[in-house]
Amino acid sequence: MVKMRDKILGSVFGAVIGDALGMPTENLTKEEIKKLYGFVDSYVEPKNYLAGKLNKGEWTDDTEQAICLIKSLTKEGIDIKKFANCLIAWKNKNPPDIGLTSLMAIDKLENNDYSGVDSSSCGAAMRIYPLGIVFHNNLKKLKEEVIKASKITHNNKTAIAGALAIAFFVSSALKDRKDFSLLDECYNYIKDIDEEFAKKLLEIKNFNNLDYIYDYFGTGVKTDEVVPSAIATYLLTDNFKEGMLKCINAGGDTDSLASMYGAMAGAYYGFKNIPKEWIDGLKNKEVIFELAERLYHLATE
């Protein structure tokens, strides 16, 4: 099963590399990115709000939360208490890039309140890919676990539907599927959670130009902007590098956009098709190798 291992490594590294490549351009417009960096195609020192807080090649809260998810997973599903405790420990280190929704939700978790926050930001979708890997062969179980893992911070129908969509596309990529018919299948998979958002994903079929897509859906932090844009980037490009470069130069919530794209594209193209310089330049990659191996064993045992 070399191929499956390569795909799972690809998904995990794709997500983390996307996060680290997109970190310096996060919260900037397309024009500001051009002015500050030119065209970004490698790791650069951040000149945005993370300047002096993170260094080039480092990841953000997107990956920190995904790591907590991976550490709390068993083949039976997610240990919610363990996941909550990991998020609390991470928050208490005062990370420079924690989102407001996550901060509020984790404060509630500290008081044993698991009801989450009613926010449609993409915090659930950005961390969800490990579930798409482990439960790629059981969509019913995948749905249950995604809802459970999302609700404790983002108790909002659009946030949950967006997380389900990303997990669905990751699971499909591991099965070598990447085509527009997946949009209809995804619609059927998530419409009971948020039909309006599910319909929005179907609109991706109307486009063949990513610049138009980013203008139409947006690339901001809201789930109904960044998730359709990430899925569209994945479906409309045909190699890992091309889609990644689009994401990190798009403006907006670039680290989440690129991370979600990377999780899907990495699962489809595999680790061997990720540019070597992006793997080499990633900080603390041995941690990511270990976590990817853990997911591989959970997904295949």
UniProtKB/Swiss-Prot annotation:
Pfam families: ADP_ribosyl_GH (PF03747). GO terms for molecular function: hydrolase activity. It comes from the Archaea. It is an enzyme of class 3 (hydrolase). Its EC number is 3.2.2.-. Keywords: Hydrolase. Belongs to the ADP-ribosylglycohydrolase family. This is Uncharacterized protein MJ1187.
